[in-house]
């Protein structure tokens, strides 16, 4: 079928033929995420997915949505767009596994000043890679041109996921008690939170060349370190949940330790963490030094090298860590549960 073209719409700043070209370029990446549960292909009004609940007594759907924030500015300055989609997927799927759910489908939304097909395809390439890492299918998406509202070379990216969990297996912290062990799963870097402060620390908007600098203690340029994709923890964490009773999971995002760890704690329980036990990457030390940021603000803003924490009974800790290591996670004991409230960094 011949594709339509509107000269009037193009004159207004929206090139629908660029949209067609984007879809053609991204098809190869989307195909990597397709499974036998996916019905139909790209181009429908909705993404169809056949839900297989075999083995579940009472399936419950869980949804999550998020974006990448101003990490996008780093991608734009470096003109590297093929990993930022991984971040988008990670921010969504890492949230839903905190309830014990398996992500099933993902959808993305890209708003841009001008649809440049090659750039859009690179973004979706990253989204598809994130879906492969998470074991979910990219069943739909939207790319919207916003001429006159956004500069031509800028874009925003957000995503949405739906997962499923058996109601009896929804994560429950009711058995959490003092003595339980908190396990850390290392991050790949800053992940996708705190970039407004990062940009201020290094004055990136006014001095983008700083992204090419390799600071003392770091083994790569600042820009490369900042753009490292958010780690996706779905498969290793679900593997642990299959064999060990996990009492709590926190995805360490905006708000750092102080805001996110308490979200999985039982009332009357606190997380006691020795600062000396936190394996802090050099990037965070550089950020703290360059910005003159207090230790409290660092732990209250950034993940400090810990992207996710799990809480288990002490007798299950070694087994949980072994499973995580078998799935490529360099997990370690971060702290313990004590009586109290919130997070105690000692």
Which residues are covered by each model-predicted region?
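Short, acidic (Asp/Glu-rich) active-site segment that either coordinates a divalent metal cofactor
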Residues: 156, 169-218, 222
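Short, glycine-/Ser/Thr-/acidic-enriched flexible segments
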Residues: 53-54, 67-68, 162-164, 188-190, ...
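Glycine-/charge-enriched secondary-structure boundary and capping motifs
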Residues: 2-12, 28, 119-137, 150-157, ...
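Short helix/loop capping segments that flank catalytic or ligand/cofactor-binding pockets
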Residues: 57, 71-72, 192-194, 242, ...
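Hydrophobic face of alpha-helices
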Residues: 23, 121-124, 195
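Glycine-enriched loop-and-adjacent helix/strand subsegments that border the catalytic/binding cleft
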Residues: 20
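Glycine-rich phosphate/pyrophosphate-binding loop regions near the starts of catalytic domains
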Residues: 28-188
């Amino acid at each position: 079928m011949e594709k339509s073209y509107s000269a009037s719409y193009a004159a207004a700043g929206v090139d629908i033929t660029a949209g067609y070209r984007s879809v053609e370029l991204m098809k190869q990446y989307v195909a990597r995420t397709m499974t036998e549960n996916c019905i139909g292909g790209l181009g429908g009004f909705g993404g169809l997915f056949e839900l297989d609940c075999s083995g579940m007594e009472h399936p419950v759907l869980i949804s999550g949505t998020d974006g990448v924030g101003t990490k996008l500015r780093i991608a734009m300055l470096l003109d590297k767009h093929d990993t930022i989609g991984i971040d988008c997927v990670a921010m969504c799927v890492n949230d839903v596994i905190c309830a014990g759910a398996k992500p099933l489908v993902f959808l993305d939304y890209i708003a841009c000043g001008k649809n440049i097909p090659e750039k859009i395809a690179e973004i979706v390439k990253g989204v598809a890679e994130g879906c492969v890492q998470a074991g979910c299918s990219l069943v739909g998406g939207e790319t919207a041109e916003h001429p006159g509202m956004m500069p031509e070379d800028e874009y925003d990216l957000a995503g949405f996921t739906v997962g499923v969990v058996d109601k009896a297996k929804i994560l429950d912290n009711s058995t959490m008690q003092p003595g339980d062990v908190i396990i850390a799963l290392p991050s790949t870097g800053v992940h996708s939170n705190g970039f407004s402060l990062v940009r201020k620390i290094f004055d990136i908007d006014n001095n983008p060349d700083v992204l090419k600098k390799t600071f003392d203690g770091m083994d790569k340029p600042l820009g490369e370190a900042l753009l490292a994709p958010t780690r996706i923890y779905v498969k290793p964490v679900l593997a642990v949940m299959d064999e060990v009773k996990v009492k709590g999971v926190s995805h360490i995002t905006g708000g750092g330790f102080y805001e996110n760890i308490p979200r999985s704690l039982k009332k009357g329980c606190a997380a006691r963490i020795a600062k000396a036990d936190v394996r802090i990457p050099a990037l965070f030390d550089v950020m703290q030094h360059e910005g003159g940021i207090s230790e409290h603000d660092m732990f209250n803003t950034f993940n400090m090298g810990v992207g996710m924490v799990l809480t288990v009974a002490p007798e299950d800790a070694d087994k949980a860590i072994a499973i995580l290591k078998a799935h490529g996670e360099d997990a370690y004991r971060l702290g313990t549960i004590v009586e109290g409230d919130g997070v105690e960094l000692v």
